[in-house]
């Protein structure tokens, strides 16, 4: 049996289900390209039949990604498989992933069928998917609670029908490692054709055991692990990719297994997903948390000064985190900035050097020193600015009366190429800025979530504001970064307004298409 573990990333499918607002096609593509740099073997990027937006994003990613296999999900229904095959047809290499529930509670309560009927549906779905590709994965949903006799029957039948990967999900995160390992071992002992497929696992974290269950599974013969960046996903989340990758790398001598993951891309990819998904990483998160390589105890610090491996089983550099952040000033030349971006893993194709350097100089004049995390934040802001924005914030001036609590904000904003200036008051500077922007744009949205964070540490940190807003019964997520919290809030609002503007254009286009169809049918 091979010692190579296939890494199947489902951040853009299972992970996205946890988000308050869906990612845009451009944001999904950014993450997909980061996953490709990271070296994932397979990336599951959506559920094409679920919506036109999901279909478009799967197709766009399938057209772009070259080095990873692109996968789409489908139920055990022909219409789902057709949609997945159509969206994936432009890919260099693709996989169709079809699934059906197999546990007694799901079969009887959700599907309202007999197990034999469900088995027949599964076989039919796999055979149908094989018409489009040889690479078909079949999942036994809620396998962790499926009677073992039924699970063995289902796995054998799916392999016989043509599935080349069989996924065993612990859908509700119910099993413990010894129990889950026994399930995998039993399949290897009792399914006669199991050597004709790769056994995969997909563990959820409801009891905090997703990573432990996945490691136990590969010790018993599984050779694919399904996971997400930062462990994001429904409810308590999924198995964390970065934890799996670093466990297998750090304990290779004991486990004897390896992956194709480029570990130096882990930190960068984690940051990107956290930023775009508006899901901060907890400080004590293994591998990528802010405190993962922090040593506060005097005894620990003394040991670290004598020998790093006294208290570090891996280095921050191994995941692409530079231990010694080089501070830069307004006197730093373009070559310094380019060099630092390269050291952090960014190629010149990932950002606009002219725009980045211009923003760097502005920030350096304000802060004095600029750090690595600042550059990453500026590159993210610059990428946002390159989008086709109807609204662009030019200037924000705020005056606040600390005794009365009333603030006045004046904004200059470009609206479709026209400069508008408006002023408004509010209950505090952020409220005043929001009111002024709403007046200038003549667009009202309802903010349902406002989160204030920091990019960096100490007094030199950049303010990061994440907002979720409702517009026409849809949720939109905006991010703003600036040295000033009020400006960051204003930028986040403008970001959301641009997203709603694009949504209006899409709605108008769909309405126009519908009218054309109706006229054509008369």
Swiss-Prot record:
Region Regulatory domain, residue ranges: 392-522
Keywords: Amino-acid biosynthesis, Branched-chain amino acid biosynthesis, Cytoplasm, Leucine biosynthesis, Manganese, Metal-binding, Transferase
Alphabetical list of InterPro entries matching this protein: 2-IPM_HCS-like (IPR050073), 2-isopropylmalate_synth_dimer (IPR013709), AIPM/Hcit_synth_CS (IPR002034), Aldolase_TIM (IPR013785), LeuA/HCS_post-cat (IPR054691), LeuA_allosteric_dom_sf (IPR036230), LeuA_bact_synth (IPR005671), PYR_CT (IPR000891)
Example of a GO biological process term: L-leucine biosynthetic process
Cofactor(s), by name: Mn(2+)
Binding site for Mn(2+): 14, 202, 204, 238
Keyword Transferase: yes
Pathway field: Amino-acid biosynthesis; L-leucine biosynthesis; L-leucine from 3-methyl-2-oxobutanoate: step 1/4
EC number from the UniProt entry: 2.3.3.13
UniProt-annotated location(s): Cytoplasm
UniProt-recorded Gene Ontology molecular function terms: 2-isopropylmalate synthase activity; acetyl-CoA C-acetyltransferase activity; manganese ion binding
Pfam families with a match to the protein in the record: HCS_D2, HMGL-like, LeuA_dimer
Stored PROSITE patterns: AIPM_HOMOCIT_SYNTH_1 (PS00815), AIPM_HOMOCIT_SYNTH_2 (PS00816), PYR_CT (PS50991)
Main location: cytoplasm
Major enzyme class: transferase
Catalytic activity: 3-methyl-2-oxobutanoate + acetyl-CoA + H2O = (2S)-2-isopropylmalate + CoA + H(+)
Every Pyruvate carboxyltransferase domain range: 5-267
Function: Catalyzes the condensation of the acetyl group of acetyl-CoA with 3-methyl-2-oxobutanoate (2-ketoisovalerate) to form 3-carboxy-3-hydroxy-4-methylpentanoate (2-isopropylmalate).
Family from the record: Belongs to the alpha-IPM synthase/homocitrate synthase family. LeuA type 1 subfamily.
NCBIfam families recorded: leuA_bact, PRK00915.1-1, PRK00915.1-3
Subunit record text: Homodimer.
Protein name: 2-isopropylmalate synthase
The species this protein was found in: Shewanella baltica (strain OS185)
Name of the coding gene: leuA
